[in-house]
Amino acid sequence: MTAADHPAFGRDEEAALLLERTHHRHDPRWLLPVSPHVCMACALELLPEPGVSLVRKKHVVFCFQDALVRHTSLVAQLVAQDQRVCIHFVRVLFGLLNSVEDGSMADLCIEVLVQLTTQPNMEQTIRCLMNECHRELCNLRSMGGSLATTTLLGKLVDTIPGLADELVMEHGNLMEHLLRGLVYPNEGVQASICYLYGKLYSSPTAAEMLSGHFREKLCALFLSTLDSAQTKDLQINCLGLLRQLLKYDLFVSLIMNKSVPVEGAESVERPSRETSLPLVLKKFLLSRDEILQVASSHCITAVLVHSPAKHAVAFIHADIPEFLFEHLSSSSEILVWSSYNCLILLAEEPLFFSKCHTVYGIEAVVRSLQGSQQMTNTELHTQGLLLFKEILTRQPEEIRLFTSSALCRDASRALQEAVSSPVLAVAAEALRAISAFLRKDHQSSLPVQYRALRALLEAMLSRCMEFSQTPLNRRSLGHACSRNSEKATLRKGSFLLSTLEGFRNACRLAVEFQGEPSAQENPFTAPSAEKEDTLEAFSEYLLSACDSQCIPMVMRYSEEATHPKLMEVFLSILHSLFVIIPHMKVKFSRKLADSSFIRLTLELKARFCSGQSHSSLNQVCSSFLYYMCLNLLSAPEKTEPLSQEELSAVSEFLQHGLPHISSRTPESLAFLSDRQYVEAATRQRQYCILLLFYLAHIHDDRFVPEAELFVAVQSFLLSLQDQGECPPPVVCKASMYLLAVCGDKDSALAEAVISAIRKFLEGIPDLRGVYTHHPLLLRFFLAYPGLMSRFGHRVLELWFSWEESGYENLDDDSSPGRTVFPANLAALFRVLQSTPSILLILLDLVYSSPVDTARKVLIVLRVFLWENEDVKVGGLIRGHFLLILQRLLVEYGASTSGGNLPLLLNLLSLVQMRNESEQELDSMAMKLLHQVSMLCGKCSPAHVDILQPSFNFLYWSLHQTTPSSQKRAAAVLLSSTALLELLEKMLALTWTETGSSPRTPLLSSAWLLTASFSAQQHNGNLQVHRTLSVELNQVLKALSFPKKMSALLSAAILRFLRTALQQSFSSALVVLVPSGDQPLSTPEDAVLAPLGKSQVLALLIGLQNLLVQKDPLLSQACIGCLEALLDYLHARSPDIALHVASQPWNRFLLFTLLDAGENSFLRPEILRLMTLFVQYRSSCVLSREEVGLILQGAALVDLSALSNDTLQALHGFLLQVQSMGLLNDQHMTQTLQSSLEGLCSRTFPAQPLFQDMLCLGGVSVSQAHIRG
């Protein structure tokens, strides 16, 4: 094959590469078949020829190198054909390398040799080349010509694996020549030798073999070379060798302990100095070359990695930290990174802080953190935060790090931005830095930046909330999904733990500042400004943040996993919050208890703290429970707070017992139930368990099975009794409560347990100390006769003292059975229904309790009696009433200002009202009547609170009994001249009262009582011991011209006047006197005396006006009075009666009353009014035709839908129409007859007593009495 066979092989290339005169003799196999068509045989002949120009040789070598790069495998096959040819070619190139002075030619030869020897199966060639290099160095008289050889060796060792070891083992004496090169005054040679040394020491095996060489010969020489290096190549290669040396502890120790003298170059007179590695590296740090600065930083880091404790001091004494801090302001990320690494390791040495390097450098660190936030290199940001954290953590407390509040604020802002980073690693490192930052000595620069600290915590918690709510990717299946989920949970737990540690340190900071008056608030805040930058505001924020963020995050995480360390930090936060805001500790403790934190803490102790494991968690749990229990007991919601002495006792057994409680609930119950002999320490643990269960139940955390707890508490109490022990009151309280709330209807206590309870309670001076306000506890004490007889009175008193005063709002006028009562009241009612005898205890409470408690008892009794119509209580408690009333009267004597007396009288009147049928008044009732009348006689009209219920009772007593008893009762009351005198005063007060006043209901009762007394005296011809004087003109004036008088008072006066009219003003009891001497003006006045005709007409107009008001009760009273008036007039002058009944205004009145719609005439008062008009033949008021229309309407009405009052009034109207013969029409007569027959076939039973008697505005009223 010739060059012509290759079209791409040009003539010029052939002339350059081939020896034409000899190439034809060469075997074609030495010719590369692709471009460039190098003939190796030609190259071997051309390169050694001295007559060939260097340019041509260089071109040949370049083409061979190009072919080696482009067609590596082909060239490898080419040279591998004959090993001898290959070795010869290597020797030719090596000879050319050492013979030429052209640096580029030398570099080209080195590159070809290196590339060629890296081909497969070149071991013999490599060995040959090593021998050539060894021979060359040994034969050199001066190391000045060793540059090419040493450079080649360095490249070969770097490229060929294992060559360094082989070179050291087989050519060890080369090291002596290399030492000669280091002292040769040529930095190029020195640089190549350092490069070679660096590659040799990069091999651990070679480094071990060369350790003695370094220790004895190279160390000092190298350090001197490093110090004196001027060219960048030598500096970089020296630093490269240093990096390799610093990988090994031995060389680090040797070089760090070595110092070498260096002569001054500036002046002959200048004495020589000694240098060391820290000083040399400091010089590189001071250079303006970034590469050297970075390399120097790397070397410092490499030294410190081995042992900061051994070597950091030397660097600190060399002031290295100062310059590292300066480099933090560099724009080079790699330089800042390197400086961070050095400073992190230097921070492990206390001298780093005692020489105040951190004080001078902290500002640079903060600025660097602020600058790194603008970079995209998150690892750099993380490393800076790590350095900041190390400084903050290790800084001695006595050396203040932040010398101004402004710098502290800048640091806080930098951390705030860092923790808000979306990169998890940055945020996590920022959390650790924040924990270290929140230290008292770091925040003591006044004024304390509470606002900045709050912003920092807000950012920290917000970032944690955001991360904790990140959903897990569950799309993958199987074990991979499980592993990913576990890793994600661990990451969340670690992040949350760091957050909680930071928050805990903030809480600790707040506690420590409480004792610092100067740290309470910012003195530079304007007085009118809002006090946000204060310790108090910061402390309140901590509590709020824990409540709204920390607790929810921990609870959510605990659903996935439970980390002991995390829970330890969390509980320590809760514990510290009790101290931070003392005035909120009780409220906070209640909220924690309501959120099941007692259960949570006990479960943690049971799970992790059994035996001696997690002792720190056990301590934190015990301390948290201790303070929470004391807080709950010191200001409980439903029971009396403990005395200081009791708190001390509780504190003692909690302190001793809580650390030893680490059992699960079943084990705790079994421990509590142990009936064997119990030692003092064990008993304290039982007290602790019982108290924890009690507080948990109080706050509705019922994690203990109630049936099992019920049995365990009984066993516990019997154990105490067996050993003759008397438990502390708080233990009794807990036991009673748990027995009450855990027992059901079917689980009754054994008599032995009841006996033990009674014995324990009798040893307690006041049940207030063991009472817990709960309906089940009330039922517990009242369900067992042995407890009720001894403690029922006091328990009920405590019950009402704890009840809220909201019973006054209960509507006792509502229909029974329809009112929805509060839970506690409903529970009490159930107890009263099951045991009515408890009502006697309640009556005693009315007498013996404070006014507020007695009022609650009264309301409860009133509502209970109103709601429970089937409970017969009159006979049960009437005797009790008499005894209590007598005791009150004896106690207060002539005074009527007893606070409970009105309440008792109210209840007495209510019980009287609850009588459903007429009953004979027995001796007990008569005595009560006598006592009440005596009491009224001692009162003045101002005693409204006593007189009103008393008058109600007297009124009901007269109207709720049989006629014979009414006569006896009236005789008793009429014998009380003091009562009659009081009534006279009350009646006279009517004319002085203006409008509606608080005394108006009492005046109404007085008029009704007077009317009743007058009727009973007149009907029974009873003896009168004192008369009542009433001004008739005032009565008529009040009714004729009513001015803002209440409807009830008007009805009462009407009833009085009606009684007087019915008696024709001849009552022996009531004397109606005129206002003054008024001569009779006409004969009619004489006939009507003591009334005058004008008064009659004025009274008629007044009655009409009152009827128009359409008040049902007032209307009935008006009609009754009108009936009595017309009867009175008819008896004296029928013409005047007819004239009064036929007044035109009566027709207008009638039609005014009938405008209420269809069948509006079917109202009792209207029917009675029409009956009067028919009776007195007032055709001008009600014509025959209109009567017929009324009859037609009545015939069509469903009688079953009408009330008894209406039916009776309708029956009276029809009878009156029939008797007057007003109907001439046969059809109408039949209609009338049919209606009468329909009514006669029906019976008109008397209205039930409890429906007849009303309580209107506090006034007892009998509808039958008003209606007449």
From Swiss-Prot:
<dbReference type="GO" id="GO:0007286">
    <property type="term" value="P:spermatid development"/>
</dbReference>
<dbReference type="InterPro" id="IPR052133">
    <property type="entry name" value="Immune_Signaling-Apoptosis_Reg"/>
</dbReference>
<dbReference type="GO" id="GO:0048477">
    <property type="term" value="P:oogenesis"/>
</dbReference>
<dbReference type="InterPro" id="IPR016024">
    <property type="entry name" value="ARM-type_fold"/>
</dbReference>
<dbReference type="GO" id="GO:0007141">
    <property type="term" value="P:male meiosis I"/>
</dbReference>
<protein>
    <recommendedName>
        <fullName>Meiosis inhibitor protein 1</fullName>
    </recommendedName>
</protein>
<comment type="function">
    <text>Required for normal meiotic chromosome synapsis. May be involved in the formation of meiotic double-strand breaks (DSBs) in spermatocytes.</text>
</comment>
<keyword id="KW-0469">Meiosis</keyword>
<dbReference type="GO" id="GO:0007283">
    <property type="term" value="P:spermatogenesis"/>
</dbReference>
<dbReference type="GO" id="GO:0040038">
    <property type="term" value="P:polar body extrusion after meiotic divisions"/>
</dbReference>
<dbReference type="GO" id="GO:0000212">
    <property type="term" value="P:meiotic spindle organization"/>
</dbReference>
<dbReference type="GO" id="GO:0051321">
    <property type="term" value="P:meiotic cell cycle"/>
</dbReference>
<dbReference type="GO" id="GO:0007276">
    <property type="term" value="P:gamete generation"/>
</dbReference>
<dbReference type="GO" id="GO:0045141">
    <property type="term" value="P:meiotic telomere clustering"/>
</dbReference>
